[in-house]
């Protein structure tokens, strides 16, 4: 079976989203000043409407298809873990690279609602793609995602101008393992890197006394299906297990401001050509998604 690598297409390839044709259309997707201020103070922003019910259902169909371990396109994933949990009694599906495989998970990168918000939260700058992720916690036995900072896994790129968008494909609640945040923790600097699917609170050992006090008061970011949460790459976050009777599925889009460079002479993602240390991140696998000056 011949497989088309959708990373070669830098733009919408389906009718799932419509690209704005005017400045007014783009402005209709803008976050408020209050929302941007909240993000800058707390390091995250939750409850941003990102997908319609129709878009959610189409993306769920894509996810069901590619989650099959026997699917012929698995060679295009950067990483594929049908169960990444370190606890044998729980399951955490985690994969990177779905944008290369299905129309829906490709086109979410060019969702204008996402792009406008991402540009604003990065400082009204052009937005470049880093990579995507899928997280799936099945009912009753969905595993945890340990408290961590995203950038602790991304030190092979610099400077720190990265942003994460986490989008719910199911209602995300305390019961099914919603994201939790420590407000203001993006100002703590870079902490050691934990095992992502290991002990939930393993990061506690690396916190000072003041940080431990704040760590004891996490904010649960419960969101509805189709809503997104944005967070800074240094914001401390994690999620508990899914003890509910329903799945908790989500996709993640990781981006950075245009101009971020490689800080490694090793491959930045599995199967992707090396971007030499010191060179700008760009090309087939790291496309420019949105430039506010050109689009608006």
Q: For each predicted feature, which ranges?
A:
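Short, structured patches in soluble enzyme cores that scaffold and shape functional sites
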Residues: 133, 149-151, 167-171, 183
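Non-heme Fe(II)-dependent double-stranded beta-helix
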Residues: 2-42, 48-147, 153, 194, ...
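A short secondary-structure junction signal
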Residues: 141, 146-149, 157-158, 175-181, ...
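Short, conserved beta-strand element in jelly-roll/cupin
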Residues: 155-174, 222-223, 230, 254-258
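Double-stranded beta-helix
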Residues: 19, 172-236, 260, 278-279
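Conserved hydrophobic/aromatic beta-strand scaffold that supports enzyme active sites
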Residues: 28, 44-46, 164-168, 218-220, ...
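Short, P/G- and charge-enriched loop/turn segments at secondary-structure junctions
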Residues: 150-155, 216-218
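Non-heme Fe(II)/2-oxoglutarate
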Residues: 2-24, 66-69, 73-74, 78, ...
């Amino acid at each position: 079976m011949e497989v088309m690598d959708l990373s070669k297409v830098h733009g919408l390839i389906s009718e799932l989203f419509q690209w704005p044709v005017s400045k007014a259309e783009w402005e209709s997707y803008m976050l408020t000043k209050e929302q941007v201020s909240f993000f800058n103070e707390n390091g995250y922003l939750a409850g941003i409407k990102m997908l319609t019910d129709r878009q959610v259902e189409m993306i769920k169909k894509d996810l069901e298809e590619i989650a099959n371990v026997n699917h012929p396109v698995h060679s295009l994933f950067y990483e594929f873990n049908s169960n990444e949990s370190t606890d044998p009694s729980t399951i955490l599906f985690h994969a990177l690279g779905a944008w290369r495989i299905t129309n829906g998970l490709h086109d979410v990168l060019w969702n204008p609602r996402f792009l406008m918000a991402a540009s604003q939260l990065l400082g009204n700058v052009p937005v470049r793609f880093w990579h995507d992720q899928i997280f799936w916690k099945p009912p009753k036995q969905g595993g945890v995602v340990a408290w961590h900072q995203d950038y602790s896994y991304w030190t092979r790129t610099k400077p720190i101008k990265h942003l994460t968008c986490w989008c719910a494909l199911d209602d995300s609640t305390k019961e099914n393992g919603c994201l939790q945040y420590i407000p203001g923790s993006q100002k703590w600097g870079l902490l050691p890197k934990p095992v992502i699917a290991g002990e939930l609170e393993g990061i506690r050992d690396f916190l000072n006394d003041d940080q431990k006090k704040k760590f004891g008061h996490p904010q649960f970011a419960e969101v509805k299906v189709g809503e997104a949460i944005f967070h800074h790459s240094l914001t401390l976050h994690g999620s508990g297990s899914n003890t509910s009777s329903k799945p908790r599925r989500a996709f993640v889009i990781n981006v950075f401001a245009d101009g971020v460079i490689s800080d490694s002479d090793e491959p930045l993602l599995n199967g992707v050509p090396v971007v030499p240390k010191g060179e700008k991140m760009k090309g087939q696998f790291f496309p420019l998604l949105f430039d506010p000056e050109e689009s608006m």
